[in-house]
Amino acid sequence: GHLFVAEQADHIELSGLVFDGSNRTMGGYTQGLLDLRRIAHLAIDNCQITGSGKNGLALEHAIGRIERSEISGAADAGIYSVEAGGLSITGNTVSDCANGGILVHRWQVAEDGTMVTGNRVQRIQARSGGTGQNGNGINAFRAGNVVISGNIVSDCAFSAIRANSASNLQISGNTCSRSGETAVYSEFSFEGAIISNNIVDGAANGISIVNFNEGGRMGVCSGNIVRNLSTSGPYPADSPGFGVGIGVEADTTVSNNVIENAPLYGMQIGWGPYLRNVVATGNIIRNAGTGIVVSVVEGAGTAVISDNIIDGALNGAVVGQRWAEPATGDLASSNDTGYAHLTVERNHVS
């Protein structure tokens, strides 16, 4: 069966209510404990939604706001929104859900404009498995113009914040602790991602702005602190492995970040031929396996690596690689890299 279903409503407002699903099985026709579809004006405030057998709160074509509510113990995601038309998800606590925290999805790539701000998301599992579909604190999928800011996200099986094919995306001012895989991920066919002023402490990889092979490009990665990364993740790693501070590929600037304790690479620039127009300047990298690795495969595009401080990189400060294999000596030791696409200068190595 179901607890609360509404469709084609002009105005629904829920305030100060407790919805407890008691972990009961739900009917196949319903998406969540509260299942609200095509709501022209939705306001949910100061509610508790707990123990859902599916999603806690499931929204389809919703416009409005969800705020100051507590959502916990969902068998799927805490909040699942699809095809929203201007939604604000603000000041909520989402915890102890089996597959996801706050999901902002669309059926096709389009503008979405959901704002996910000031929420606490914690202890999100990936009970249904996979390599990233589940286990994320905040997830934007095919949704453009989404803002994810000022959230505190901890103890997620995969990513604290994960965006797939989400263009014109802002991820800023979030605190991401103890992520099982990549803490902040912008992947697949996105165009335009600003990832700035976030704190990442504890993850397999820190921040990834990747998948130029799928058309993923155009990013700014600045002012982040990324530290205490691990070489182990929730599944056997693809090459080159886990333990990378920041990874970028195309049309992206990486500036003024501080990376500490990245056991594989402090920074990874490009993967095989998937490298174009990357500038990495003014970063500090401490205690890394290799400070910065950059692709030197035939077909790799322009990269400028300058004015960085690299302190305590065990396997070299700046090293050219062919995919996962080192192909050069330490490029930081002279200004001539021997590669036309690559400028490495004025880096301070200690």
Q: How would you label these PLM feature ranges?
A:
Residues 149, 196, 203, 219-222, ...:
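Low-complexity, intrinsically disordered tandem-repeat tracts enriched in small residues
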Residues 5, 13, 35, 43, ...:
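Extracellular beta-strand solenoid repeats
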Residues 312-321, 327-350:
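Leucine-rich solenoid repeat scaffolds
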Residues 185-187, 209-213, 241-248, 268-272, ...:
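Short, contiguous acidic/charged loop-to-helix segments that flank catalytic cores in large enzymes
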Residues 1-15, 20-41, 56-61, 107, ...:
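Extracellular beta-strand-rich solenoid/capping regions of secreted or surface-exposed proteins
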Residues 9, 39-40, 62, 85, ...:
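Small-residue (G/S/T/A) turn/hinge positions that recur once per unit in extracellular repeat modules
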Residues 1-3, 23-30, 53-60, 75-83, ...:
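Short glycine/acidic-rich loop motifs that flank beta-strands on beta-rich extracellular proteins
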